[in-house]
């Protein structure tokens, strides 16, 4: 526990080593008395993602982090589903081109897979599942899902974001996710929607 402006802060472990995700959540949840700490800062290694869905993997990650630290945990599992590919890369989005693949390698593999697919048939959906576990054996974890629909562009554009953002084109805005500002993206993205649901639950819980 730590104090912030007279408020006792409850430590919550975030089941990720991604500093961007930690900062994003830390700023948003501080107002609810939650002190977000990355699992890497507590010496927690990543859980093996053996689930078949985003929800299963998010729960696995949260339960692992909570069991090791004894703290409440939040986990995020996200990915991109392309309609014409039957929902691929899906839960394998981060390792689409291999276990150690870079964002660029994953992106290039997807562009190659869609090389002959015309406009109008390149619809895709980003999904984000956020899970909140009060403790490792929590029988009723809080689960929040956000989705974002767009199209896969024929080439990358923009330098912001990460992952598939440079080729995820949003027709309503006329730009890719990587061409948006952080605040603009958070207002419409899959992660932003899931975060808003989590924040709403915290307000009423």
Curated annotation (Swiss-Prot):
Signal peptide positions (record): none
Residues of the active site: 77 (proton acceptor)
Family assignment from sequence similarity: Belongs to the HAM1 NTPase family.
Natural source organism: Erwinia tasmaniensis (strain DSM 17950 / CFBP 7177 / CIP 109463 / NCPPB 4357 / Et1/99)
GO biological process terms, semicolon-separated: nucleotide metabolic process; purine nucleoside triphosphate catabolic process
Name used for this protein in its record: dITP/XTP pyrophosphatase
Class of enzymatic activity (EC top level): hydrolase
Alphabetized GO MF terms: dITP diphosphatase activity; ITP diphosphatase activity; metal ion binding; nucleotide binding; ribonucleoside triphosphate phosphatase activity; XTP diphosphatase activity
Known role: Pyrophosphatase that catalyzes the hydrolysis of nucleoside triphosphates to their monophosphate derivatives, with a high preference for the non-canonical purine nucleotides XTP (xanthosine triphosphate), dITP (deoxyinosine triphosphate) and ITP. Seems to function as a house-cleaning enzyme that removes non-canonical purine nucleotides from the nucleotide pool, thus preventing their incorporation into DNA/RNA and avoiding chromosomal lesions.
Note on how the cofactor is bound: Binds 1 Mg(2+) ion per subunit.
Catalytic activity: XTP + H2O = XMP + diphosphate + H(+); dITP + H2O = dIMP + diphosphate + H(+); ITP + H2O = IMP + diphosphate + H(+)
Cofactors, names only: Mg(2+)
EC number: 3.6.1.66
Gene Ontology terms: cellular component: cytosol
Subunit structure and binding partners: Homodimer.
NCBIfam families for this protein: RdgB/HAM1 family non-canonical purine NTP pyrophosphatase
Binding locations of Mg(2+): 48, 77
Pfam family, one: Ham1p_like
Tagged with keyword Protein biosynthesis: no
Annotated keywords: Hydrolase, Magnesium, Metal-binding, Nucleotide metabolism, Nucleotide-binding
Residues reported in the UniProt entry to bind substrate: 16-21, 78, 162-165, 185, 190-191
Keyword Cell division part of the UniProt annotation: no
């Amino acid at each position: 526990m730590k104090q912030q402006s007279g408020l006792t802060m409850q430590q919550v472990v975030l089941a990720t080593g991604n500093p961007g995700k930690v900062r994003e959540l830390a700023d948003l949840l501080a107002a609810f008395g939650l002190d977000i700490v990355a699992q890497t800062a507590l010496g927690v290694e990543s859980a093996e993602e053996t689930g078949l869905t985003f929800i299963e993997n998010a729960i696995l990650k949260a339960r692992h982090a909570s069991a090791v630290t004894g703290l409440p945990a939040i986990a995020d599992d996200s990915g991109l589903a392309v309609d014409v590919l039957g929902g691929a890369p899906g839960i394998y989005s981060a390792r689409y081109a291999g276990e150690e693949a870079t964002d660029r390698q994953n992106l290039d593999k997807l562009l190659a897979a869609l090389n002959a697919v015309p406009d109008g048939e390149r619809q895709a959906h980003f999904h984000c599942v956020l899970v909140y576990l009060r403790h490792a054996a929590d029988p009723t974890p809080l689960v929040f899902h956000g989705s974002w629909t767009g199209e896969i562009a024929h080439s990358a554009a923009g330098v912001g974001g990460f992952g598939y953002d440079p080729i995820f084109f949003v027709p309503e805005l006329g730009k890719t996710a990587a061409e948006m500002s952080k605040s603009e993206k958070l207002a419409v993205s899959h992660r932003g929607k899931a975060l808003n649901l989590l924040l709403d639950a915290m307000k009423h819980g």
